Amino acid sequence: MTAGDAEGRSNAFRGRRGLVERVTLLFGVPALVAFTAIGAGLMPSQFFEASCAVGAAFGTRIACFDFMWNALTVGAFVGLVGPVVGTFVVYREMALIGETIAHAAFAGVALGTLVLGAVGWNATLFAFALVTAVVGAVGVQRLAEHTDAGGDVPVAIVLAGSFAVGVVLLDLGGGFATVEIGSYLFGDVSITDDRSVRVMTLVSLGVVATVTAAYKQLLFVTFDPRAARVAGLDVSRYDALVVGATAVVVVGSMRILGVILVAAMLVVPVAAAGQVARSFRSALYGSVLVGETAVFAGLALAWSYGVRPGGAIVVVAVGIYLAAVAVGNR
């Protein structure tokens, strides 16, 4: 290969990378503003009336129902923050941490169901799930640091142990159960109520703002933690930031994807984008594009064929990943 050929390929790659970033920003920023307005309850009623009329003109009235907009809004934010946080998780070789946090959050849901049912309070399970998710993530770090268990052993212990605790708590709760636990295991569009939408909107905006503010430091710590420590960065603090953001994203996404599948949105879009990306930044933008495509296509399939949205979303994401593998190996 001549120097001219190499330069031409490099320029072509930079052009493709710039195109992905421009497309993501061109469609992503207006969509983020729109879904933020919906999540905050600021979207004018005329928007929903017009959407209903357009849908009716095409023979469907699904756009007339609130649950559809709730699911789309939560899904849009899942497709955004899952890959954003997941990019740092995957490149730090922590792919299984999302699965562990999800199972720890399940224990929190079980605990919250037991406690709230016993005392008769009508409160959200989000706080219980978030606390146990963070405890599970910290538990993995502590086991890795203070025991001889290496590799994925601490992850496997916390993953299995937290899920087992959840099962035991559900059995102990018996008649105190106040929610359909299957909706948390597999996801359910019908439980994405207005409160869930508001929580996910706030969570997503907070995560995006935090990652944006600490982007350079997180990037440094991700690729060279030793050099980052020498440079004076508090690596442990940024590790905790990534773990905390992962916990928040996992718990916020459980309502639509379910505990079993929620970790997929942290890993699969990033893995797909990584097959064709040549830089961290392009992988980040590409993973968001894959995540949003998987969410909207998956929801469309779920509503068309009456299947669970979490499974449909992940199936689409895996399909995109396999296509990216085929393209990347050419």
Model segments located where?
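Small-residue-rich segments of transmembrane alpha-helices in multi-pass membrane proteins
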Residues: V29-V33, H103-T113, I157-L169, V235-V248, ...
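Membrane-interface helix termini and inter-helical loops of multi-pass transporters
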Residues: P44-C64, G120, G175-D194, L301
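Helix-loop-helix "hairpin" substructures at the membrane interface of multi-pass membrane proteins
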Residues: R198-P269
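Transmembrane helix-bundle core of multi-pass membrane transporters
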Residues: A57, V155-L159, F163-T212
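Short loop segments and helix-boundary regions at transmembrane helix junctions
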Residues: T87-F176, A273-G286, A302-P309, G328-N329
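Hydrophobic alpha-helical transmembrane segments
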Residues: L72-A76, F126-V131, V153-I157, V197-L202, ...
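Membrane-interfacial amphipathic/re-entrant helices at transmembrane-helix boundaries
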Residues: M1-F77
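Structural signature of hydrophobic alpha-helical transmembrane segments
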Residues: D66-L80, N122-V134, T201-L205, G252-M265, ...
